[in-house]
């Protein structure tokens, strides 16, 4: 198994699909990486030479992925909460952020129903 960005990439899969195992790399970015490195999208990871895998590593290192991306996302959410803006308040209360209705739906975000006390 090749190790790129701290993740074991599956050997049996095509390069484009295998790169999506890295958090922060989707299909579009994986295709862009393959185009930039001149590696065929349909080539399987086990068929690549060590030099090609090193080139892939260098190309992936140009992007913010995995732990750094997760940290950046959580810091952005924390910043919104500290600012006290509307989105920050919605995050703090664990409610939907983007204008969805909450009178009847939003159970996933709000959690299980709480019984009404009498």
Curated annotation (Swiss-Prot):
One annotated Gene Ontology cellular component of this protein: small ribosomal subunit
UniProt keyword Chloroplast present: no
GO biological process: translation
The entry's keywords: Ribonucleoprotein, Ribosomal protein, RNA-binding, rRNA-binding, tRNA-binding
Residue span of region Disordered: 94-118
MF terms in GO: rRNA binding; structural constituent of ribosome; tRNA binding
InterPro entries from the UniProt entry: Rbsml_uS13_C, Ribosomal_uS13, Ribosomal_uS13-like_H2TH, Ribosomal_uS13_bac-type, Ribosomal_uS13_CS
Pfam families, alphabetized: Ribosomal_S13
Alphabetized PANTHER family for the sequence: 30S RIBOSOMAL PROTEIN S13/40S RIBOSOMAL PROTEIN S18 (PTHR10871), SMALL RIBOSOMAL SUBUNIT PROTEIN US13M (PTHR10871:SF1)
Family recorded in the similarity comment: Belongs to the universal ribosomal protein uS13 family.
Reported function: Located at the top of the head of the 30S subunit, it contacts several helices of the 16S rRNA. In the 70S ribosome it contacts the 23S rRNA (bridge B1a) and protein L5 of the 50S subunit (bridge B1b), connecting the 2 subunits; these bridges are implicated in subunit movement. Contacts the tRNAs in the A and P-sites.
Subunit structure comment from the entry: Part of the 30S ribosomal subunit. Forms a loose heterodimer with protein S19. Forms two bridges to the 50S subunit in the 70S ribosome.
Name of the protein in its database record: Small ribosomal subunit protein uS13
Gene: rpsM
């Amino acid at each position: 198994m090749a190790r790129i960005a701290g993740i074991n990439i599956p050997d049996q899969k095509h390069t484009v699909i295998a790169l999506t195992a890295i958090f922060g790399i989707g299909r579009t970015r994986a295709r862009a990486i393959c185009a930039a490195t001149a590696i065929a999208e349909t080539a399987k990871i086990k068929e690549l030479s060590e030099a090609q895998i090193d080139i892939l590593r260098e190309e992936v290192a140009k992007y913010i992925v995995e732990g750094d991306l997760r940290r950046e996302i959580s810091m952005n959410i924390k910043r919104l909460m500290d600012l006290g803006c509307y989105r920050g308040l919605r995050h703090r209360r664990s409610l939907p952020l983007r204008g969805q209705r909450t009178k009847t739906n939003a159970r996933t975000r709000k959690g299980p129903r709480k019984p009404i006390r009498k």
